[in-house]
Amino acid sequence: MSKLWGGRFTEEAEAWVEEFGASISFDKQLVKQDIEGSIAHVMMLAKQGIVTNDEAEKIKEGLQYLLEEAKENKLHFSVEAEDVHLNIEKMLIEQIGEVGGKLHTGRSRNDQVATDMHLYLKEKVQDIINAIKQLQKVLVDQAEENIETIMPGYTHLQRAQPISFAHHILAYFWMLERDVNRYEDSLKRINVSPLGAGALAGTTFPIDRAYSAKLLDFEGIYENSLDAVSDRDFILEFLSNSSMLMMHISRFCEELILWSSQEFQFIEMSDRYATGSSIMPQKKNPDMAELIRGKTGRVYGNLFSLLTVMKGLPLAYNKDLQEDKEGMFDTVKTVEGCLHIMAGMLETMTVNKENMGQAVTQDFSNATEVADYLANKGLPFRQAHEIVGKLVLHCTKKGIYLLDVPLETYKEMSPLFEEDLYEVLSPYAAVKRRNSAGGTGFVQIEQALEKAKILVGEVTRN
């Protein structure tokens, strides 16, 4: 077939070269955005008198017809037409005649594709924000049910101090809230229109870029035409934000995997989010959590792939930039899927409160309470730390825990120990007493939950 750009050429490209250079297999995902951008462009052309109102109306009707066909998956794309832009333009000309060729007046595929991707990410970032909010609501619900569920808190994967399970869950809530903030902030840079920048230098036609930007609900336009068509930092920022989000939920998945093991038995996954073994009939594997953990590397890879593509590109457009889309599409699909699975997995899991509580009574995670007890009685904390360290060593040799040590033994270590010591050794008491701002104390958790509910829209401010 003849190319829409073929006037300069005397030879046809090899079929395999066309296939290698074509992007229609993946950029057809931008068909909605491409048509919407074209409608705004032709309306601007009519406003500026570059095409007649009748021509614009005919082109607009043709584009709207193609958009409806696209929604019903009735469009047939061809490799010969290379990409979504030329496919749509070819279909438009076939639909309404040669007047369809006026659509591309004052525009290049360079600013066209950049516009498409800005429109695409503007929509998808908001979808991801909404999905994060749904996951946050699940975390709030689980936290409310587990304010007084006591579990070991860990450092170095060693039991450190007793905490509320709700406190642990809410840690991820606030990580996700920062992810939301990053995505929201990125919209300032995504919601800018490159349309009208042309190939690189603008156009001689008297276009109105601000008008087409307004029609597409952009907040502004790129100030430099070279910048508008050359950079993909808005995609890189999206991939970076998505990588951080995936890192957060991957860490949570790692803990869910550990907690669901026989060694912990803190939670049990719903059968809906687990699988079995083809050989071992007893197995219940946390495959969905493992897949999310694995797919995190995939999202990281998409970020580093585009960074590597971009690092040596001179201005303005280069064909290398065709490689900017597949990683973007893949990341959107991966992130949305992982958030959906994560919410369902957390909503349906069973929390084994008894096992968590039992675990925290069979360790030395209350040792800090003993050191704080001595410090509150005036002993320098470093001396208190030394004394409690010796007490722990004594207990490990005897095979007992701090609650099992008789008062006489405590007094041998320090005369400051009194009967009231045993009141602070209880894990429940230890958690309740940690009432500093942001701590695991029950009052602090309830306050944190109120803030969290406001953020996810469950309650309104007075």
Swiss-Prot record:
- Where is the protein localized? Cytoplasm
Q: Which reaction does it catalyse?
A: 2-(N(omega)-L-arginino)succinate = fumarate + L-arginine
Pathway annotation? Amino-acid biosynthesis; L-arginine biosynthesis; L-arginine from L-ornithine and carbamoyl phosphate: step 3/3
InterPro entries the record matches: Arg_succ_lyase_C (IPR029419), Argininosuccinate_lyase (IPR009049), Fumarase/histidase_N (IPR024083), Fumarate_lyase_CS (IPR020557), Fumarate_lyase_fam (IPR000362), Fumarate_lyase_N (IPR022761), L-Aspartase-like (IPR008948)
> Per the UniProt record, which EC number(s) apply here?
4.3.2.1
Entry keywords, A to Z: Amino-acid biosynthesis, Arginine biosynthesis, Cytoplasm, Lyase
Give the Pfam families listed for this entry: ASL_C2, Lyase_1
User: Where does this chain mainly localize?
Assistant: cytoplasm
- Kindly state one GO CC term assigned in the UniProt record: cytosol
An example GO BP is:
L-arginine biosynthetic process
One GO term in the molecular function aspect is:
argininosuccinate lyase activity
PANTHER family, sorted: ARGININOSUCCINATE LYASE
Family indicated by similarity: Belongs to the lyase 1 family. Argininosuccinate lyase subfamily.
Q: What is this protein called?
A: Argininosuccinate lyase
Q: Which species is this record about?
A: Bacillus cytotoxicus (strain DSM 22905 / CIP 110041 / 391-98 / NVH 391-98)
Recorded name of the encoding gene = argH
